[in-house]
């Protein structure tokens, strides 16, 4: 290996990063340099990532992101590169269930008759079959994590090419992933599950996506704005000039004038109409620009249906 001269580079610090890859430990040396990273160029000498100008309103959910900009509107799944991520998520679940079955078969003394784990100190034994499955599960999780990060970077670069002012709501993933505290019974007298959005947040990384977006815009000379909590983009109806609370299941809903809109996209449109002076929704901008962006939204939804793209929790039905 040839030595690399670092005399002309200011080195900030060095980090040793151990990783388990395909069952073997590997140690990587991370060199962190001072200053800003140089821009990337393609093989033709052009900038690899373009920086756009304009406003982008984005509604970041637990599994999807909807955005409205001066050039295009969009709605897509978070942290997804093709359809392979859904297959990988399913394989993670299958491996985890296989590990649980093996653990129960090897350690029956640690479980109650109803299947719950006994309290107190326990000694666990793991079979060779369990260890092999665990290694496969760990390797699959590692690959999925890398693919998620690559997908996040690709989406962040695309959004930066649409504009230089990014407007969104504050992060709330840490609150959504917590289990519900209240015990509620449904109409049949059964307990409602206390699980919320932990699995979706783990698979789609909305907070990681938002952090990457914030860093991307601020480092590249853009602006990142989080609206105040009283903004309530998901409840406002500009045709009625009122805040109307909706059910979580209402993904497609009708405005007061009878227009059907996709909920996430409409929230991104209201974020696009943010008034930086009053820190509130610019109602005049909503009225003047809604028809133009509504036509773009309808065209985009038709494109999703024609290409049979499954957008999670969007309410868009694919034949």
Task: Put a short name on every predicted segment.
Residues 1-23, 199, 203:
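Acidic carboxylate diad motif detector
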Residues 27-319:
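Positively charged, helix-rich recognition surfaces that bind polyanionic ligands
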